[in-house]
């Protein structure tokens, strides 16, 4: 029984990433589906759908993934820290960008506080419906 995201690159070839399902079938990330997600998807997915494109820089994609996870953690008691974030730049051929994010991580705390504050701020700036 397996459900995972698997990706990487063989030297001289394009990089790729796959989502593998328990039945053995898989899907590959494409231009139309520039990211893959496993686990609880309903809370953080709208953020990914609105931000991530094929052209999104890797650092912005990582930030978006963490904001998505923060939203999921906020809305689902069964999801929590720690988080493992591995960023694998094209043609790097090694894993130098691994973060294990726990309750003490200052960057994740900042994301949590800033995202919540700014979301409430923009919500209050949108006009109420006219009846």
Predicted regions: what is each one?
Residues 1-131:
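N-terminal nucleophile
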